[in-house]
Amino acid sequence: MHDLVDFKGAIHVHSRYSDGSDGMETIIAAARAAGLDYVLVSDHNVLKAKTLGWEGWHDGVLVIIGCEISPPRSGHVLALSIHDCDGMKKMSPPEYLRRVREQGGIAFVAHPSGNEIRDFNLNLASWKDWDNPDYHGMEIWSYMHDWIEGCHIRNMLEYIRNPQDHITGPQPDVLQLWDQLAQSRRIVGLGALDNHAANLPFRKLPWKILKVFPHEQVFRTVRTHVLIPPPSRTNHGDVDSFIDALARGRCFIDYALLGDGTGFQFTASQDGLDYQMGDSLPAGRPVGFRVQCPQPAEIILLRDGAAELAADGTALEHSTDGRPGAYRVEARINRKPWLFSNHICVRAGEEEGKKKRR
C-alpha cells in the first residue's frame, strides 16, 4: 500500500461539448493552476472530448473523459470507460446501465437526491434504482448541489459573493443510504462538482451578464483523492490505472478550503495483512484500524454510519473483535466537514484477497 500515489482532482465537470461555458484548454489550464493532478470531464450524453483525443495527459494534468447519461425524467450516472453513449438518454436506468456494463464501463450515480429549483431552470430526478447491481458507486457530496440548496433569486448575489458560507457538506440522508448499501456490497463514494462555469442569468436568455464559479475557483473546493500506482505518464496506462483505482474505492474526499487532505490514510490490518479503502476482510477475527490525517482535526471512525470512536489530533487507532460492518472515517475542522474516506468492510464469509504482508 505504501507505493500508492495520492492523485487529487475534480470529478464531474462540463465543457462546451454539452452545457458548460469553457473549452477543454481552459478547463485543463484551470486544473493546473489549482494544483490538480487530474480532471474528470463528463458532458451530457456525448463523448466528443474523448473522440477528439482529449483523454490522457495534457500540460501535466491527467484528463479523464466520461459521459453523464442524462435522461430527462430519471436519474443520471457518470459513465467511464465506454466508447459509445448514443441513445442512452432515451433509455431507462436498467437499460443504460446494462449498455455501460456490456462495454466494459463503470457507472456512478450522480446527484442521487435530485433537485428542483425553478429559479435556475433545474429539474433533476432522484435516483430510484438502488437495487440494480450494475452501478459501482455514487456521488456523496456534490459541491454545486450543496451550494444551491437554499439559493433563490432574492439571495443569489450573497450566495455568489460568499459561496463558502453556504456549504454544509454531504446530505445526511445520502450518507445514511451509502452506509446502508455498503453493508452488502462495495459502493464507492465520490466527491463531485457538477460545475459548468456558468454565465448569469442561469435561465436560457439571449444575453449573459457574468460568469460565476469559474473552474479554477471551484477546483479548490470538493476534491476526490485517488490512490494509484506511480503513473507511467503514458495516456492509456494511466487512464486505465486511475479508473481501476476509482472502481475499487481507493479514494477519499477533501474540502480543500479547509486544508489539503494529501497524506490522509485509512487502513486496516488482520492476521499480518494490510487492507486499504475499498477492501473487504473476513469477520470474526481481530481487526486493527489506523487513521492518519495531514493536519489536526476531529477524527471520527464510523461503523454502519454510527460513531465507533472519535479523537482530536492527527491520528486514531482502534482494535475490534472483527464485528461485521462498513467502517469509514470523517474528519472535521472547526466543526466543518473536511475529509470523508471510503469504506473498509468487515463481512461474514468474506474471502481473503491478495493483500500485501507488512
Identify the residue ranges that each predicted region occupies.
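C-terminal functional module detector
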Residues: M1-D6, S184-G189, L193-R358
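A metal-dependent hydrolase metal-coordination microenvironment
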Residues: M1-E158, T168-S184, A192, A198, ...
